[in-house]
Amino acid sequence: MLFKVENLNLVYDMGKEVETYALRNINLSLEGNRLVGIMGPSGSGKSSLLYSLAGLKAPSSGTISYSGIKYSELSPSKSTALRKKDFGFIFQRHFLIDYMTILDNVLTPINDNSTKARQKALALLDKLGIKHLADKKPHQLSGGQRQKAAIARALINDPKVIFGDEITASLDHESAKEVMKLLDEYTSNALVIVVTHDASILENADDIINIWDGSITSINKQRMEGYDESAINL
């Protein structure tokens, strides 16, 4: 089991007269080597679940384990090291470094400027159709091109888990399909978790987690392996 979530609650304004539940009593188990979608209306808690799984949001109560390790038992430095080693992140905003070239931006997670690393980065940019922009700066690219560069950056360290939050929002439909096809290829060696409003990009998903008002209401199973029905709180 790659991720195990038990009795997870995430509460904002905890202790105040009015508390806001972002996540309510979430129980979930996820295996690796899959494409998992998280869907729900705005404010439903889907991004909160993604960031909690990634260790970027600490739960108000409950536990999250990754490869048998509870996040709550890790020091901040060990948590950071784990994310850097095993995780790749793709956010709705690209967060590219303005003064660096696209190629150098892609290389930042691995801090490696060797010929081999540069060739790997260029190969990723080529798969995403923007290799010709490797020497450009972020401001010279369109929004969709910058997002593709951010995707290449997330993949450069061969992560075991790829987290994506509305990653195709700035892409046209064809580009979105190309990106999801590339991410689907990574499921042979990684777990890919994608938050989206667009159900059409999840046509190849193994599971789609549906969230409403902070609770998992259902999981649509495309394929049965790796899905633990007993761990879902409905």
In which residue ranges do the predicted regions lie?
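Helix-to-loop junction immediately C-terminal to a conserved catalytic motif
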Residues: 54
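Conserved ABC transporter NBD signature motif
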Residues: 62-71
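Catalytic Walker B motif of ABC-type/P-loop ATPase nucleotide-binding domains
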Residues: 162-165
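ABC ATPase NBD coupling module
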Residues: 20, 71-88, 228
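Conserved ABC ATPase signature
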Residues: 137-147
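Short coil-to-helix segment of the ABC ATPase nucleotide-binding domain corresponding to the Q-loop/switch region
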Residues: 100-107
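A short, proline-enriched helix->beta-strand linker immediately N-terminal to the Walker B motif
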Residues: 156-160
